[in-house]
Structures are given as structure tokens and as C-alpha cells.
Swiss-Prot record:
Single biological process term from Gene Ontology: DNA repair
Ranges of biased composition (kind: Acidic residues): 197-207, 945-958
Biased composition annotated in UniProt, kind: Low complexity: 999-1010
InterPro entries given in the database record: AAA+_ATPase, ATPase_AAA_core, BRCT_dom, BRCT_dom_sf, DNA_pol3_clamp-load_cplx_C, DNA_replication_fac_RFC1_C, P-loop_NTPase, RFC1
Protein name per UniProt: Replication factor C subunit 1
Compositionally biased tracts (Basic and acidic residues): 90-110, 241-255, 347-357, 965-977
Keyword Nucleotide-binding assigned: yes
Underlying gene: RFC1
Region (Disordered): 1-259, 339-392, 931-1021
Biased segments, Basic residues type: 123-138
Swiss-Prot/TrEMBL keywords: ATP-binding, DNA replication, Nucleotide-binding, Nucleus
Amino acid sequence: MSSDIRKWFMKAQDKNGGAAKPAGTTALAKKPVLSIPEKPSAAPSMAACDQDCSARRKTSKYFASKTEKEEDTSAGKGTGRGLPKRKLQKVSDELEDDMKPLPAKEVHKEEEDDDDDDFVAPSKRKTPVKPPPSKKLKGASTAEAHGKTGLDDDNEDKMDEDAKTPSKASGSGRGRGRGRGRGGRGAGAAHGKTIGLDDDGEEDKMDEDAKTPSKAAGRGRGGASGGRGRGGGGRGFMNFGERKDPPHKGEKEVPEGAPDCLTGLTFVISGTLDSLEREEATDLIKRYGGRVTGSISKKTNYLLADEDVGGVKSNKAKELGVPFLTEDGLFDMIRKSKPAKATVAKHQSDKNSEKQQKSPMKSSPVKVERRDGNQITTGKNISPKSNKGSASIDNQKVNIVDRGSLQWTEKYRPKVPNDIVGNQSMVKQLHDWLRSWEDQFLHSGQKGKGKKQADSGAKKAVLLSGPPGIGKTTTAKVVSQMLGLQAIEVNASDSRGKADSKIEKGVGGSTSNSIKELISNATLNYSNNRLKRPKAVLVMDEVDGMSAGDRGGVADLIASIKMSKIPIICICNDRYSQKLKSLVNYCLLLNFRKPTKQQMGKRLMEIAKKEGLQAQENAMEELAERVHGDIRMALNHLQYMSLSQSVVKYDDIRQRLNSSTKDEDISPFTAVDKLFGFNGGRLRMDERIDLSMSDPDLVPLIIQENYINYRPITVGKDDSGVKRMNFLARAAESIADADIVNVQIRRYRQWQLSQAACLSSSIVPAALMHGNREILEAGERNFNRFGGWLGKYSTTNKNIRLLEDAHSHILASQQANLDRESLRLDYLTLLLRQLTDPLKTMPKDEAVQKVVEFMDTYSLSQEDFDTIVELSKFKGHPNPMDGIQPAVKSALTKAYKQGSSSRVVRAADLVNIPGMKKPLKKRVAAILEPVGESLPEENGVASSEGDEEDSSDAENNDELVPGDTKPKLDLQSDKKKGIQVQLDLKSNGNGLNSKKMPAGRSKASGSAGKAAGGSGGKRKR
């Protein structure tokens, strides 16, 4: 596709197969003009437009006035390719030219319409009137330079637009965008362009070369919003995806038209419109019965755009011959569809007169009105029918009453698989699995002729997963009924815990016992009398809800699947739930998806028609989109609306579901993307609060981690970066304020400040920084990172815990008396040198022996060794373990483990008390009594229990009493947290728990004291 759109018009696209063209056409008409394809009769023709419409259109900045065109053509007269550089006009002159009244045009009226509605090729234009000779000569001078004839003046509009906005032509990226610059390919979006199809003249290229002689933009006009190519430069990808605000937003009055004036028409919206947002234009089209799609196809009637941005949609529309339509053209189409007031009044009077004429001729049949399922009969005369006819009416009345009392979700529940909306492939897989279940798992053991062995990959159960309301349970029931199976449903309202071990309770026990009896007893389904009792299938609904109330339910369900003799269908919403982590290994996984809005809209239209509701198709599609594919919820809304109205329009759906829309779960990353997106500034305050409070813990952390990567769209072109830094400072200050508020919430339980914290931590930074995300370092991925604070906080707590362990071990060794801070700042470096330097410089055996002795001296374990090394690592500094050979490391580990059996342990948490199977969750501190009181009691206890004590031990204890006093005094007087001894004191004789009595009175503490005295305060394990 050439970059010059006019070349497309100059190509000989003869659709008549070489037939002779009609005579009487001028040179201007020789171009192949797009003709409007056959459209429904409801679409009004856009060929002609009155003078008021054209005058109103000229107020848009995308169309130049007549005076500007004459000045441009006179300036370019006879210049050929070497056009002089135009001077920039002042803003006041632009406004004056735009606001000048248009002169009356008589001769060139048809061409005015062509200029105004360039996107809509008129079908009624046959022979346009030739312009005056002077104007023709002016246009001819430029046309001769290009070798073309009959071109419009829209290229001058483009030149004026470039002259008014010269800054948009710059860019420093090597983006091979689809820009129209010299050397570029395609059509970019960096410049505002006129709406005409013939706006790609060579003049704008020459103007661009004259204004921007430097080729910093690379291949193509790779400006700030330059094409969609490889924008690898500093500014080439800056504003990609940005949708600018309409230039005349809210300045035009939205017209009113006939209710269904756009019925049967399909629109595609492209670019930025003149006064409407894209969402507003979509709502306007759907309100009058039109359809809006996202891509161009053969069924598209119009491409709605106020400027030809030259994207994929524009090129596709030109290839398929889809006419272009401006916003003003859409307004005219709607406005002309509304009849005049006099016509409406006359039509209403005629309608009333017809009713009056027909009313006496009608018989008075029985009128049946439905109000909440009740029938009200009005009128006394009954049409002359037989008794049979009246009886049929009575029967019909009774049936209507019975069916009217049902909810629509039950009334229109699918009866056959073809009635299920969407997921037909999943229905087919479930049908095939159920049909072949008996052959695979019941008869597979029979080695008869022609019997297939069971497939090793086959599953005895199936797991249906998907959002609620899309037909999972209905699918299970319908398919089971179709195959002649009796579906036994067990949902979340039933007790589904672990079955009783005493299975003899059988069906007389709990629901779990009944299920176990059902799946394990073959006589229930496979007895001799099979015809009287149908085969069964167990439907376990909402298995992801088997939580605390159903203890052991999932494990018992897995055991039931293994031994089951009937098919089991499990249904859940979230197949990735942790509760189902083990269940998915035993089930065939079938993932149900949400049906499309077109599928749901078609089904809802059928139901509305059966219920006598007049509903628009786009209204039903909007309802399907608002409920996120939940057809059950859509039917409930539709039934509720049918009680108060008989016609459901698009606006009715929007008005009802704006306040009662279905909630959906969104991740914190999705919430941050919406807050910081280009449309984040258009969100209402309640929407921002909902997004921020979707996860009040993670959303602020993700925002704090990523807000500096966003370039705000509100700062515009900021070469110096001062505006962006100002916004960053304000956002950082708001986050700091939120941290102060969050401390009050978390520490002092001031939860009434939650909204203030939400405002400061999420809403204010997002309002300041929403825009395009960009990378700040080479190699960085351009997506939101997870909050780094959580990982750093966890690492900090782990390091503090490990340092506390090493601190307690060093204190217990009695080689140093220091606090944790001194250990980290002063001693850790010295300890690291003593542990690593010998391994680097000395021979292996000597180094290993020295390091092990040093570790024994300070009661350091291997975990402490790793802690000291890990805490001594710093970014940008070498690893302390560098230079140590792997053989030396393995020798050190081996030597330390060899001496562990005889190693002296001085820390209380390393003491292994005999008889204690596992450590207690809450250890009790041993009570160390004064020496003067504990020794007599201890000796007394030893003498009273002499049958269990050796006399030699008692003698040694008496001898070591003077040496036993010093360690006990040190332990009692030292208040350090690290040397608090924690033991599980138990008595061996009478089974009493010594935690309930003083440590000095127990036998265990007495023996502990003896051992401590014998080893000089050291205990051997």
C-alpha cells in the first residue's frame, strides 16, 4: 500500500470487467470513487447535506476555511516541488480565520459536500460542477507538479496543520513507524490530518522537510506518537497507545433521533473523535440500535473517524470499500431520522382514529394478563367457540399459571445438550467420558475376546471448572440424563466430611456414609434387575468449598474415587485452589469458559420473545457483557425487569446495571494497571477506591515499587524533566503520608483511617503519575514488579533471627560478654577472618583443625558459620568464601561432623533431654535458685531418693559443691536474653511433671546440677 492515498484513487480498478464507462464524466470523475454498498433502507443517505450542516462542520479544526485554502493555493502557485518555507501564523490569526463567516457558495456546492464528507463517498454525485477558471488554474499549477489532475485542496489543509503544530514532527527514536516522512513507510499518527481521502499530497512532505531538516527521527516520522514500528529511541515509544481527549469535548449537542434509526448498521470506531469520547460514541450508536465492532470486516457499514490516521483499520476499510463517516455525519444521520413534530402529531391522530374505528368491530375475547404468575380475566363476552376450544383455553391458562410461578432460570434450564450456551466441546468430552466409563473401569478386567484393556491415562472422575452461572451443573445433569444415568447431587449444603470408619452404619448414618455406601456397593446399580433401577452418577458440586466444616473431605473423596464403581463428576470454580492440589491428579480436567456476549445475547433474545418482552439485540449483548458471562444472573435481571416494563432498551440495561453490576475478583496487578493506565484519570472516585481496596496490603506496595517508571500524560512534552520530577516528588510525599497513617492503623487498630490511607497511598500517586510506563535501565522488563518491600522485610527478619542464635551461642561459651549490636558491628568482621583466612592460606589439614577448634571455643555451629559469612556479604564487594577450594570446604564439614558426638555444648537449645521425643512448642524456662537454698534441698532430695542414686555420685556431689557455686551465680546474675536456659524438666521415678515444681526440688535439676559441677559448667551429650 503506497503512502500516498491518492495513488490508490489513480489505480485503474475496473469493477465492470472492462465495460465502457458512462459518458459525460469529467476528469475529476475519472477517479474510481468509493461507492456505498447496498445497505438497509433504514440507513439514510449521506450524499447531500444542507448548508447549515456544512457551516457547522467548518468549525472543526480538521477543516480549513475557504480563505485559508485560497491563500495556500496562491502561495503554492507555479512552485512545483520547490515550495518556499511557510511562516508560522499566530494563534490569533488562526482563531480569526476559523471563526470567519463562510461566504455563500453557489457553483461549487457539490464539491463542498465532498470536502466535508470525504469519508462517505456520495452515491448520487454524477457530474460535479467545474470550478471557476481562476481556481482551476491555481489548483492546476500544483497538480502539474505531481502529474495528477483533479486533486482536492486537502493537502493545503495538511500543510496548515503542520505549520500550526511543528513540534509534533520531532522524535529521536529509530522507530520504523508507519510515518509518512521521507524515507518512511506507511502512514503514522504523529500529525493531525484532515478527514478527506485525498489528504496525502506531496506538499506536506515538502513542508516537513523545510521545517525539520534534521533527520533525527530515523526512517519515517518517528515522533513522540510515531508509528507502531520498532521505537527503540529515547522518545519513540513514549506515548504509544495514548488516546488524546477530543478537541471539542462537550461543545456539540448530541442529537435525538428515531428509536431504531441505526438498526442493522455496523460501525467501527477509529482514532479520536471531535467531541465524543469513544465510549460515548459507542453508547450513542447502541442506544439507537446499531452495533459496534472492533475490527473491519465485510459486514461493516461505516468506519467512524474524524481523521485518517492511516492505521490498520483505515487501510482495511479502503481495501474492502467501507465508507468513512465523521462524527458530524453520524449526528446528521441520527438527527434526520427523527420526524418533524407536525408529522408525529398527524401520525398519532391517524393511529387513534384507526383504533376507534376498529374497536366496535372487534369481539371482546378473554384478555389474559400476567402479574407475578396470576391470571386476570377481563370482559364478559367470549368469542363463539365450541366447548372444546374453551376447554383448551382453560388448560392453557392452567399451564401458564404453573409455568409462570417458576423462576426463569429453572423454566428455561436446558433440557438437551444443544440448548447449553457455549462450551460445546466440553459437553462433547464429558459425554464421551461418561459413555465409555463402564467399559474402561468395570469390564476392563474381563479378558474376553474383543474387550479393550483400560487406558492407563484414563481418569475415574472428571473435574468441571469455571466461573459461576455458565452451566457446569446443568451440563452434568443433562448429559447424565441423556445417557440414562441418575444424577445424585451433593452440594455445599450437605455435610461432606470424612466417612465414619464404622461403615455398618450405612445409609442410616451421615451423608458421607451414604456416599461411601453408594460408590462401594455394586448391588445398588448392577443387580440382576437393572431395568427397574437406573445406573447412578455422583455429582459433587463445589468441591473447592470443602473446607473446615468438611474435615478430611477431599482426602476421603480421593479414596472414594479410587474404589468407586460409579462415575463421579466434581464441579468447582477455581481449579487452582490449594484445596484441590491433590484432587486434580485423579480427575479429567474440563475447563468451562464464559460464553461470548453474542451467544448469550441470542439466547436471551429467544427467552425474551417467549415471555412477550420487546428487547433490542444490543441491549441483550450489553446485559451479557455486564454480568461477565453469568447467564443465571442475566436471566434473574431480565425477569425482574419484565415485572415493571414490557420493552427493554439499551439505556434500561445500563441504568439498571450501573448500580447492581456483578462483582469480579481482580488481582492487585490488574488494579494497578487500571489506576495507572491512560484512562486512569477518567475513573470515578468510587471506582478508584474499589480498585485500591481490592487488596489494601499489596496494591500500595506495588504502586510504591513502580510509580517512578510511569511518565505522566499530564506533563506533555517536558524536555527538561522538571515537571515530571515535580509530580514524582508529590507522589513520594503522598506515599510517605500514607505510611504514617498506616502505622496508626496497624499498630493502634485505627481502622477508621482506612480510606485516608487508601487515598494517600494509591489514589493520589495514580492521579499524578498515570500514563505510559517506560524502562529506566537497560534490560529491564516493561511490566509492573512485585513489591520488593515484602521480600526485604522477610530477609531482614530472617537475618535478625540467625544473628540472635549466633549471639546466644557466643554468650553461652563464656568467651565474650557483648550485646547483639556490638556483635554485628565490631566482632563479626574479626570472627569472619578467623574462620576464613586459615582456609585460604594454611594447609588443608592444619587449617581445618584450627577452624574447628575455634568454632568449639565459641560454641559456633555450622549454621552460625553460614550466618557470619552471609551477613558479611555486601554488594560490590567480593564474596568472603572466594579463594577457598571445594576440597577444603568438604574437609571442614567432615571434620566438624566427626567431632559432634563428643562436642561440648554450652547453648540450651542444643541440649537433647533423654525421654523427650519432640521439642515442645512452648518451652518453660528452668528456675535457677540461689546457691545457699538449693544445695541443702538438692542434697535432701538425693538422700531421700537414695535407692535411685549411686553413693559414688553423692560423694562426688559433696566434693564439688564449692566449685558448683560460681557457674550458678553467673547464670543467676546475668540478665542476657541469650543465656536463658530452657529445659523440659521431667522426673523419672513417680511420673510427676517437674514444670509444676521448682527446679531445685526435681530430680532432673539435681542431676543437671551434678553434671554441671563435674564438668566445670559444661554438659556433655
